[in-house]
Amino acid sequence: MGERTDSGSASGFGMNPTLGGIGEGATLRQIFPRLPHAEAELLGPGDDAAVVRAPDGRFVVTTDMMIHGPDFRSAWSTPHDLGWKAAMSNLADVAAMGARPTALVVAIAAPLETPVDTLLGIADGFRDACDVAAPGCGVVGGDLSVSPTLTLAVTAFGDLEDRAPVTRTGARPGDVLAVAGDLGRAGAGLWLLFRDGVSPGAVTPGEPDRERAAATRGAHPELVDAQLAPVSPIASGIVAAEGGATAMLDVSDGLVLDARRIAEASEVALRLDPVMIEREAEALRTVDPVVGDRAARFVLAGGEDHALLATFPPDRPLPVGFRPLGTVIALTDAPDGRPDALVGDTPFDSRGGWDPYADWDGNAG
């Protein structure tokens, strides 16, 4: 889909001047020219609210947050990474509905000592992510505030262009389960960062180390980039909708967990083909052999790749860019009669994915 063009490094979090030093107005005057322009924009940043075209008469709307600690570490991510990832995760949610992303509203809360260059790098990340993954989408407004913890909150809008939305509820027995995009890379990248990108002598276990993380990224760019600045196949959302997708979501929390969400919403079970999962694992090992025998686990439970997982009628060819992973089966054919995601005929495990309330540890990540 394109290449990331990083405008900064993790050291961008330690440069001057600061937000507290120049204030909100001066900061915004530097940010606005760097933001991507939305083709649907009628009135953009600078007024009390934006005005955006809604030619379909409907809006697809989604919101996602990124908070320092559970969602990112400034020692690992560049400011550009943060803007890119915040944009991409929201664009993927819009795409998963079969819509075209049209506009973003961005709110950022940051400590007073945050360098202005950090905000400029974040803005550049939004610009580049939109340019690469969703041309024509841009930032139309937002808010800037003060907080002891750097936080990004993004609301994304999309246009269905007279199509029906693709929800999680439409999967039917016999449908083909398929995916567009990468699986397992982001999870493997996070594993590498916690393995190699931390300070071995820190008082707090798992304390991120900027230099070690940069070295890890340099040694394993395909995996660490996928974690810190993922590329989602945004255009494939419309392709899937026009190709007859019956259900769809983006894989943000892990293949098994997100497949289970389709199963529960559609009241079916999803059977992942072990042969196809091994194919995905082998592809991951080809990208970087460091994953070794962990590859299948990363494919099934890694999360944050923002691939698009969809179901399609069995009598139609899969759209370009999608590859099969399994099938949809009736609950009467599931081993325990419950909506679930199975690997063959076996449930993967009790969770098999990321839950921010259950899984985050302030030390271990």
Can you say where each PLM-predicted feature lies in the sequence?
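Active-site-proximal betaalpha loop/short-helix elements
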Residues: 113-115, 221-303
